[in-house]
């Protein structure tokens, strides 16, 4: 039976291939920026604060994501380092993007005299939703898949036929780990938004820390299924190690910060008053 494999190239512009991976990633980023800008206005910041940050944050995130990937796949680039600059076929690591974007955000908020924790809280739900969307770029690139399985297993998950067909990689069916993470991230987005709206529940900074806890917990287990993991040394998967560290660190930070009686709740009206009068 011939399977209808998706084409990773969406179209060609003046002979230059434009990949679905890039289109999906950009779409996720655009949605994240729009959602973050709306939340920024609700807590007393300006839309331009979000848009201006993207001038810093997006390049930093892309560079961080690429350097992170290349650092652990150096053997693929050592003989032809010019390939480091070619990202249309993938090769971006989410954790590297978070590190690069996080550093840019720290310096940006300091430069603008904006609370770093507030900005992180604004962005966190949008970021995890963008990650959920971005995983479909992996699907279009036929990457980020799991161990070998059977078509019957995939059918038992009640997946659409186009997903099942495209989990056939080189004649072998694989588990759709991209989909597992995408669904996990969508659930995380819903949880974070609901908790963020709940008055007097989350303290400032805890939306972001909740994102770290949720994402790293799911990523730890999903990463264990992936066939294309980056390895630090021996059989230690980089993303699993980093997920474990971030999960524990985020919980510890929440506990320590909760001991501060002056720590404010993430409350839009109070936060708006505080920001606009400072």
Curated annotation (Swiss-Prot):
Record Pfam families: LGT
Metabolic or biological pathway, per its Swiss-Prot or TrEMBL entry: Protein modification; lipoprotein biosynthesis (diacylglyceryl transfer)
Transmembrane segments: 13-33, 50-70, 89-109, 175-195, 205-225, 236-256
UniProt entry keywords in alphabetical sequence: Cell membrane, Membrane, Transferase, Transmembrane, Transmembrane helix
GO biological process, one term: lipoprotein biosynthetic process
Highest rank taxon of the organism: Bacteria
Residues that, per the record, bind a 1,2-diacyl-sn-glycero-3-phospho-(1'-sn-glycerol): 135
InterPro entries, sorted: Lgt
Membrane topology: Multi-pass membrane protein
Record keyword Membrane present: yes
GO (cellular component) term, any one: plasma membrane
Compartments where found: Cell membrane
Molecular-function annotations in GO: phosphatidylglycerol-prolipoprotein diacylglyceryl transferase activity
EC number, as in UniProt: 2.5.1.145
Function: Catalyzes the transfer of the diacylglyceryl group from phosphatidylglycerol to the sulfhydryl group of the N-terminal cysteine of a prolipoprotein, the first step in the formation of mature lipoproteins.
Family statement drawn from the similarity comment of this UniProt entry: Belongs to the Lgt family.
PANTHER family: PHOSPHATIDYLGLYCEROL--PROLIPOPROTEIN DIACYLGLYCERYL TRANSFERASE (PTHR30589:SF0), PROLIPOPROTEIN DIACYLGLYCERYL TRANSFERASE (PTHR30589)
Protein name: Phosphatidylglycerol--prolipoprotein diacylglyceryl transferase
Organism, scientific name: Enterococcus faecalis (strain ATCC 700802 / V583)
């Amino acid at each position: 039976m011939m399977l209808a494999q998706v084409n990773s190239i969406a179209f060609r512009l003046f002979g230059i291939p434009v990949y679905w991976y890039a289109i999906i990633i950009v779409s996720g980023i655009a949605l994240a920026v729009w959602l973050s800008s709306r939340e920024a206005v609700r807590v007393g910041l300006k839309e331009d604060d979000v848009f201006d940050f993207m001038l810093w944050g997006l390049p930093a995130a892309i560079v961080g994501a690429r350097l992170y990937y290349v650092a652990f796949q150096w053997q693929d680039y050592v003989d032809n380092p010019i390939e480091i600059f070619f990202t249309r076929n993938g090769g971006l690591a989410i954790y590297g993007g978070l590190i690069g974007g996080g550093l840019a955000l720290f310096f940006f908020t300091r430069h603008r005299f904006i609370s770093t924790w507030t900005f992180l809280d604004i962005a966190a739900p949008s970021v995890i939703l963008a990650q959920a969307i971005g995983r479909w770029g992996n699907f279009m690139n036929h990457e980020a898949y799991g161990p070998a399985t059977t078509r019957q297993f995939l059918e038992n998950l009640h997946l659409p036929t186009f997903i099942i067909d495209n989990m056939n990689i080189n004649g072998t069916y694989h588990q759709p780990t991209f989909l597992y993470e995408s669904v996990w991230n969508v659930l995380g987005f819903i949880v974070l938004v609901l908790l963020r709206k709940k008055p007097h529940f989350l303290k400032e900074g805890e939306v972001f820390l909740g994102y770290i806890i949720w994402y790293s917990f799911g990523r730890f287990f999903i990463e264990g299924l992936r066939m294309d993991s980056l390895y630090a040394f021996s059989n230690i998967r980089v993303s699993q190690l980093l997920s474990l560290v971030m999960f524990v660190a985020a919980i510890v930070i929440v506990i320590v910060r909760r001991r501060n009686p002056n720590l404010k709740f993430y409350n839009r009206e109070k936060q708006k008053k505080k920001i606009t009068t400072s």
